[in-house]
Regions:
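Bacterial N-terminal signal peptides that target proteins for export
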Residues: 4-14
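Domain-terminus/edge residues, biased toward the C-terminal soluble/receptor-binding domains
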Residues: 150-154, 162-167, 171-252
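Bacterial N-terminal signal peptides
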Residues: 14-22
Length: 254
């Protein structure tokens, strides 16, 4: 009974967190949405505009990572596989690692750069090395989305950089987040990493919630001007996991 009570309190706190975050933000962003689900049962504990389409920003990289993990799982690549950097990838706007054209980056470093730094150049590197072009990789991402049950999502790039046709919903991102944790539990542990070092430079996580909320262990933050700040996150208490997604914050509350 005590554990059930503690879990009820946990659910209440998570739901309250989402309510406070959404309804204390500025009205400068019309599209606000959120969803909280129980990981084990997939029960929706709270939702607001969960099916409203919005720009995913860097939450896009969750799918880029999902596909990368899938390739690793199928032994099509290894953590030591070197990915070549093209001129197009090197030219991507920040956030980025400032990779140089013609250089390479190992898969294991690319994974951490996407999780911690949210590097747009690395996202394009992954896309081009898997599918030849980022356009083709985006088609692959959308195909994966449909197979996972993400019916309202269309990807146009691997990074989340602005594209009016790249759209998703809070519900779809919760489905993706659940699938990533379920299908790649060992890889998901990497999302709890708070910093990583690449070529002598240390990068720290953008996800401040992991530093302040007990039990939080991921997942991803995002921002573009057109949509505001976004967050997909997961937390565990008393061996119970919840997943939450927020869209359309006008400032970082976490």
């Amino acid at each position: 009974m005590l554990m059930e009570h503690d879990m009820s309190v946990f659910k209440f706190l998570i739901t309250s967190f989402f309510l406070i975050v959404i309804f204390t933000t500025s009205q400068s962003y019309a599209k606000k949405a959120a969803i909280v689900i129980d990981f084990d049962t997939k029960e929706v504990l709270f939702e607001v505009n969960a099916n409203t389409k919005n720009y995913p920003a860097s939450l896009t990289k969750i799918m880029t990572l999902y596909i990368l993990f899938d390739r690793l799982e199928k032994n099509q690549i290894t953590n030591q596989t070197k990915l070549k950097v093209s001129r197009i990838a090197a030219s991507r706007s920040p956030s980025k690692l400032y990779l140089e054209e013609g250089s390479t980056i190992k898969v294991e470093d690319a994974i951490m750069a996407l999780i911690i730094k949210s590097a747009n150049d690395v996202a394009t590197v992954v896309a081009e090395n898997i599918s030849g072009t980022e356009k083709e990789f985006a088609k692959l991402m959308t195909s994966y989305a449909r197979n996972l049950g993400m019916t309202n999502t269309t990807f146009k790039n691997a990074s989340g950089l602005p594209n009016r046709a790249q759209l998703t919903t809070a519900r779809d991102i919760s489905i993706l987040s659940h699938s990533l944790i379920s299908n790649f539990p060992e890889q998901y542990k990497l999302f709890n990493t708070q910093k990583f070092t690449y070529k002598g430079k240390t990068y720290k996580t953008h996800n401040k919630l992991m530093l302040s909320y007990e039990g939080a262990d991921g997942i991803k933050t995002g921002y573009i001007r057109a949509s505001g700040f976004q967050l997909a996150f997961s937390a565990v208490r008393n061996n119970k996991r919840l997943i939450g997604v927020i869209f359309g914050l006008s400032l970082i509350h976490i």
